[in-house]
């Protein structure tokens, strides 16, 4: 077991950046290997590390274990606060521990040491009169009550997931950590990420840029360089899996590098709603407000989840006003243009519009290829451009779908012991490609666009040229080129036998105007989301 872990650690150290290795892999320790059940238990020192390693590195560790023992190995992660102190070279295999459940219960803050139980009716010690004994008992009872109250407050604070301001300030005063720093500062790094909830892997360096997201990336970099000054708030919107969350984590990580003492918090809108409810139940709104109003950077993801939640919106409005007044930066993401989010108070919508709103579009072909090539490289796999282009051409919706497809291809190749070719890719993605081809057709595009612009489907094939017909027809041609595998001549034939040059002109015209016309861009975004279901 220890030989394997030394081998595994050495490989991961070569594959990962120094920051990733020191932060996530080095604190782990193997604690048990059950040869009969083919299970390996690995301990992590805290819940945050355990959850992250489990989600990001368990697959790679399982692969290395299978290669090492020449058998499928189930890797289980367990919690052990002393994991980072273990020495793999001298570790003694322990009995296998039960794996932790997948749910993430709220962390329990360590309370003060339990006060000794007080028996008010116990006889007084020798030499102590009854009055003195009663006074001592009363003092002990008060001390116990105070300890219990402190423990209760600590539990509630942990459940609310609000790091204390004193913890923030203390860490800010002593923190000198940078990515790749020595082990002495790894504890400070852990503390930073646990408080901020930032994902240190999501940076500007590994964000693939193309026409679809270059404006959003430029705005994000500007905000990271000048928080609270350039664009406040910065509002990013777009479909699922297009990189909104990656970008806002990148901003937070960049600010931590530039200003290690900055008070930063990433939170999903659902968690914010949950915290508001808990604060209301516990009458802890003073703590809630003090925490959120004191931040330097608030990153709130998927704000559409605030829809219909008036108390949450009210609290967020006050937090927003306080942060902006203090020149703190607010960054928000949504799946929809701000004014299109239903169930949100008008005064919040007006605040969203007061900064910069930027759309992130589905990646274009070249960008999808670049994403696949980079992801394959990070997995230590050589992927030919032919295969990358094939996958990128057939899967168009978002980055997560591309990465999921690549994982299927890699697993299929490894399982069958075959080289990754276009033929193998077709086999691996057979079901996915069938669904994609069935979902979107030119006929469906024509009907959807006609309904959207209130014209007849027959107008798509006609020779009529009024602007209210010609424009939707050009948009339908553009979407047919973007969302189907049809060639230009095939698309032209389906639009009333038009020449392929007519289709090409329409595609180029709409693509060019999309980058300049915010209203057109929004309409296309709505149509694309509708067609993709």
Curated annotation (Swiss-Prot):
Residues 111-120 have a biased composition (Low complexity). It is found in: Cytoplasm. Its main location: cytoplasm. It comes from Burkholderia pseudomallei (strain K96243). InterPro entries: AAA+_ATPase, Chromosome_initiator_DnaA, Chromosome_initiator_DnaA-like, Chromosome_initiator_DnaA_CS, DnaA_C, DnaA_dom, DnaA_N_dom, DnaA_N_sf. This is Chromosomal replication initiator protein DnaA. The gene is dnaA. Residues 197-413 are annotated as: Domain III, AAA+ region. Belongs to the DnaA family. ATP binds at residues 241, 243-245. Domain I is involved in oligomerization and binding regulators, domain II is flexibile and of varying length in different bacteria, domain III forms the AAA+ region, while domain IV binds dsDNA. GO terms for molecular function: ATP binding; ATP hydrolysis activity; DNA replication origin binding; lipid binding. Keywords: ATP-binding, Cytoplasm, DNA replication, DNA-binding, Lipid-binding, Nucleotide-binding. Gene3D superfamilies: 1.10.1750.10, 1.10.8.60, 3.30.300.180, P-loop containing nucleotide triphosphate hydrolases. Plays an essential role in the initiation and regulation of chromosomal replication. ATP-DnaA binds to the origin of replication (oriC) to initiate formation of the DNA replication initiation complex once per cell cycle. Binds the DnaA box (a 9 base pair repeat at the origin) and separates the double-stranded (ds)DNA. Forms a right-handed helical filament on oriC DNA; dsDNA binds to the exterior of the filament while single-stranded (ss)DNA is stabiized in the filament's interior.
């Amino acid at each position: 077991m220890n030989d394997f872990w030394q081998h595994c650690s050495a490989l991961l150290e070569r594959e990962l950046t120094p920051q990733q290795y020191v932060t996530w892999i080095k604190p782990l320790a193997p604690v048990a290997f059950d040869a009969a059940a083919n299970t390996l238990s690995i301990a992590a020192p805290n819940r945050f590390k355990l959850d992250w390693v489990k989600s990001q590195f368990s697959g790679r560790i399982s692969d290395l274990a299978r290669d090492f023992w020449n058998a499928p190995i189930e890797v289980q992660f367990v919690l052990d606060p002393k994991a980072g102190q273990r020495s793999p070279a001298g570790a003694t295999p322990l009995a296998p521990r039960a794996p932790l459940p997948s749910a993430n219960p709220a962390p329990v803050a360590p309370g003060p040491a339990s006060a000794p139980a007080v028996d008010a009716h116990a006889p007084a010690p020798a030499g102590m009169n009854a009055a003195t004994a009663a006074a001592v008992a009363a003092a002990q009872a008060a001390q116990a009550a105070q300890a219990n109250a402190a423990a209760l407050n600590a539990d509630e604070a942990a459940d609310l997931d609000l790091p204390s301001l004193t913890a923030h300030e203390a860490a800010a005063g002593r923190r000198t950590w940078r990515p790749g720093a020595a082990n002495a500062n790894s504890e400070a790094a852990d503390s930073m990420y646990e408080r901020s909830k930032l994902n240190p892997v999501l940076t500007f360096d590994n964000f693939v840029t193309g026409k679809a997201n270059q404006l959003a990336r430029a705005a994000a970099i500007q905000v990271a360089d000048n928080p609270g000054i350039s664009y406040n708030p910065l509002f990013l919107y777009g479909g699922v899996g297009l990189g909104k969350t990656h970008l806002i984590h990148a901003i937070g990580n960049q600010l931590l590098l530039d200003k290690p003492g900055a008070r930063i918090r990433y939170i999903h809108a659902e968690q914010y709603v949950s915290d508001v409810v808990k604060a209301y139940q516990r009458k802890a709104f003073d703590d809630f407000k003090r925490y959120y109003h004191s931040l330097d950077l608030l990153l709130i993801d998927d704000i559409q989840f605030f829809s219909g939640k008036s108390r949450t919106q009210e609290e967020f409005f006050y937090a927003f006003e306080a942060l902006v007044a203090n020149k703190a930066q607010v960054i928000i993401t949504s799946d929809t243009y701000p004014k299109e989010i239903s169930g949100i108070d008008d005064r919040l919508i007006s605040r969203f519009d007061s900064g910069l709103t930027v759309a992130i579009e589905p990646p274009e072909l070249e960008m999808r290829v670049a994403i696949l090539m980079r992801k394959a490289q990070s997995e230590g796999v050589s992927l030919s451009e032919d295969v990358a282009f094939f996958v990128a051409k057939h899967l168009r919706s978002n980055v997560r779908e591309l990465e999921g497809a690549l994982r299927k291809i890699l697993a299929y190749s490894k399982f069958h012991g075959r080289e990754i070719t276009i033929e193998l890719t077709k086999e691996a993605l057979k079901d996915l490609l069938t669904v994609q081809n069935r979902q979107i057709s030119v006929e469906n595009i024509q009907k959807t666009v006609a309904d959207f612009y209130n014209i007849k489907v027959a107008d798509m094939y006609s020779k009529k040229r009024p602007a209210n017909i010609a424009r939707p027809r050009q948009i339908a041609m553009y979407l047919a080129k973007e969302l189907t595998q049809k060639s230009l001549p095939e698309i032209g034939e389906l639009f009333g036998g038009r020449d392929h040059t007519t289709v090409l002109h329409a595609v180029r015209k709409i693509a060019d105007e999309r980058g300049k016309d915010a209203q057109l861009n929004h309409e296309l975004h709505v149509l694309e989301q509708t067609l993709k279901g």
